[in-house]
């Protein structure tokens, strides 16, 4: 809590936290151990707060990306303090048999659940971790560029350290 309080005191206006309020912990529902109003806690730290629920009034679930975007755009207008956005969700949605189930917190979903999730989302359940070739090639170029930049920095630092042994120590 000290870090969050410090962020509020320092008015870190470019910091945004999106809190996934799925109401589940390893032992069951969070209400057995978590009673405070999280938004009021962050307001007390000096943060701007807002919330959106993906759980609809009728109990159905819809990830409202447009609504979340509006909440984030509104928060973006706040520049004098950090932002805390609470998003009410269902853990493991839309995994068949695991949605809103404490067993999905902190443990593997399992082969059958992953297969069902892939089918639900329209992915081939027999393909593990598909990566687009163009995206992979781009990631490799970025990695190469990073390695080159790191080597150049190491060389420049070594020259500087040799020329400035007192400061480099």
Question: What function would you assign to each model-found segment?
Answer:
Residues 1-143:
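Glycine-rich ThDP/TPP pyrophosphate-binding loop and its adjacent helix/strand module
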Residues 141-169:
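Hard-cation-handling environments
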């Amino acid at each position: 809590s000290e870090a969050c309080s410090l962020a509020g005191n320092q008015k870190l206006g470019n910091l945004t936290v999106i809190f996934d309020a799925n109401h589940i912990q390893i032992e069951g529902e969070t209400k057995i151990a978590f009673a405070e109003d999280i938004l009021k806690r962050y307001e007390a730290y000096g943060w701007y707060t807002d919330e959106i629920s993906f759980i609809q009034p009728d109990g159905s679930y819809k990830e409202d990306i447009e609504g979340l975007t509006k909440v984030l755009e509104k928060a973006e207008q706040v520049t004098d303090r950090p932002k805390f956005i609470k998003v009410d969700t269902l853990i493991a949605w839309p995994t068949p048999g695991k949605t809103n189930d404490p067993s999905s917190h902190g443990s593997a979903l399992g082969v059958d659940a992953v297969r069902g999730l892939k089918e639900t989302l329209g992915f081939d359940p027999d393909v593990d971790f598909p990566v687009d070739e163009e995206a992979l090639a781009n990631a490799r170029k970025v990695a190469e560029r990073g390695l080159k930049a790191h080597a150049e920095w190491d060389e420049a630092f070594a020259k500087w350290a040799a020329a400035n042994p007192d400061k480099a120590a």
